[in-house]
Amino acid sequence: MYCPFCHAEETKVVDSRLVADGAQVRRRRECLECHERFTTFETAELIMPLIIKRDGRREPFHIDNLRSGMLRALEKRPVSVDDLEKAIISITEEIRRRGEREIDSQMVGELVMKELFRLDHVAYVRFASVYKRFKDVSDFRQTIDQMKNEDKEKS
C-alpha cells in the first residue's frame, strides 16, 4: 500500500482490528520511509449477479433499487427501518447464496413478496399489484383471498 504522505510503496501493518460487526478490518499502518502512521479499512467486495429484466436486458444488481421498491410498498406503513433492512439483507443473502452469475428479476420479485408478506400485508398487496401487473379489482381480491388462506393454514 502506498503511503498517503510521501507516496512510498513500502508500509507495514502495526495493528489490525475487526470493526462493523466483523464486516470490516481496520488496520494501522506505518510508512517505512517517512514513519508516518495512517489508518485503512478493508471490506470484502461481494459480486452480485446480473439481473435479467422482463424485456431481456441485463443490469447489475443495485441494492438501492431493491430498497426503493420496498420503501414504496411500505410507505406510511408501521414497519421499522430496522425490519426493512433485515428483509433487504435476507433477500441479498439469498441471492448471493444461490451463487449464480445471472438471476431473473422475477426471482428477486418473489423474494421481495415473501419478505413483504412477513412484514406487512398491505405492503405485500401494493407490491404485488405492480409486480404482477394487476388489471382490475378482481386481481386484488384474488391476492387478498390467497393471503387469507395462507394465514388460515398457518393458524
Curated annotation (Swiss-Prot):
GO process terms (BP): negative regulation of DNA-templated transcription
Gene Ontology molecular functions: ATP binding; DNA binding; zinc ion binding
InterPro entries in the record: ATP-cone_dom, NrdR-like_N, RNR_NrdR-like
UniProt entry keywords in alphabetical sequence: ATP-binding, DNA-binding, Metal-binding, Nucleotide-binding, Repressor, Transcription, Transcription regulation, Zinc, Zinc-finger
Record text on cofactor binding: Binds 1 zinc ion.
Names of the cofactor(s): Zn(2+)
Domain of life the protein comes from: Bacteria
ZnF start-end (unnamed): 3-34
Domain ATP-cone per the UniProt entry, residue ranges: 49-139
Summary of the function given for this chain in its UniProt record: Negatively regulates transcription of bacterial ribonucleotide reductase nrd genes and operons by binding to NrdR-boxes.
NCBIfam families on file: transcriptional regulator NrdR
Family: Belongs to the NrdR family.
PANTHER family associated with the record: TRANSCRIPTIONAL REPRESSOR NRDR (PTHR30455:SF2)
Record protein name field: Transcriptional repressor NrdR
Organism: Legionella pneumophila (strain Lens)
Gene of this entry: nrdR
